[in-house]
Amino acid sequence: MKKTLLATAIAGAMAASGAQAATVYNQDGTKLDIYGNVQIGFRNIEAENDNGNIETQNDVFDNGSTIGFAAEHVIYDGLTGYMKIEFDDFKADEMKTAGRDAGDTAYVGLKGNFGDVKLGSYDTLMDDWIQDPITNNEYFDVSDTSGSGSSVVAVGGEVETDQLTYVSPSFNGLELAIGTQYKGDMEEENVTSRGNASVFGGAKYTAGNFSVAATYDNLDNYEVTQTGVDNKQEFGDRYGVTGQYQWNSLRVALKYERFDSDLDNVDSVNFYGLGARYGYGYGDIYGAYQYVDVGGDTFGNVVDDATSGDSPSDTASDRGDDTYNEFIIGGTYNISDAMYTWVEAAFYDREDDEGDGVAAGVTYMF
């Protein structure tokens, strides 16, 4: 389940507010909430086996069961400090034998008339403003530069760590954001002998039921080979634009996202996405379509490429001609205010149907 769906009452958090969070302390301007969920599902997916072949595989799995703590304290009128920490490596389907050795989100921040600033590990600006409006689903996701879905290029979860982000207050509907990710020379994942800071930022404009957002990240902390590091080769940039419109219970969003590669033998990738979600009273039904253009130059002739039927390539040298048509459909049904079920199906248009599958599950929130 996407982190933005978790229930929490902290005003400074990016997660949605919900009634399930339990306020355990609220006195003298200090508030502490405890919240969480148990998510268990079943999936049947075309995946690679130990021999490198694609075959149908299934299992009962934990879909991100989480427990979280959120606190805030009024420092003085117009300035509030806050923190949030979540743990989601519980493996609820194998609780008796599975270890718990990983967290999910942890940050501290200040918010007030000046805006909002926070430091720690959390969803990126690209995830919140660009990717989530298209597919904020339970399990399956379309491909993107963060590694979701059957992504052909991705930076992985490391991009969410060691972040410092400032978001301005709204100026007649306009919000501005700027941030950095810093990796010091003591970081294990730092392949250089010095500290390094990336730069990311964006803008979001809201007018009534319509909003549009644009973000950019120079990904300056990433490399793929030691040779690239030694030659001072750049990894590449990523950027995106998303527009969305909310009409009663229907939300429709359009996305353009691009990884602009500076690496030898690694192609740039364009992601063109369309997503919709409709609340029917007892839950949501939703779907998304995305056209993935590997090796494309900016927008290119998208319609012509999509209808020409470029097929996946077996070799990296030919992969610049690949295009994929991805589809995801799903729905939820609310059993109660705290419990719901869901079912999803995904089609990624990869060779041997890799990644295609169906999944269903149940979630209980508190």
Curated annotation (Swiss-Prot):
What GO terms in the biological process aspect are recorded for it?
A: monoatomic ion transmembrane transport
Major site of localization recorded for this protein: membrane
**Membrane topology per record:** Multi-pass membrane protein
Gene3D superfamilies (alphabetical)? Porin (2.40.160.10)
Q: Which Pfam families match?
A: Porin_4 (PF13609)
What is the organism field in this record? Halomonas sp
For this UniProt entry, what's an example GO CC term? pore complex
Subunit relationships = Homotrimer.
Where do transmembrane segments lie in this chain?
Answer: none
User: What InterPro entries does this protein map onto?
Assistant: Gram-neg_bact_OMP, Gram_neg_porin_domain, Porin_dom_sf, Porin_Gram-ve
**Protein location:** Cell outer membrane
Q: Which gene encodes it?
A: hopP
- Keywords in UniProt for this one? Cell outer membrane, Ion transport, Membrane, Porin, Signal, Transmembrane, Transmembrane beta strand, Transport
Q: Which GO terms describe its molecular function?
A: porin activity
Name-wise, this protein is Monosaccharide porin
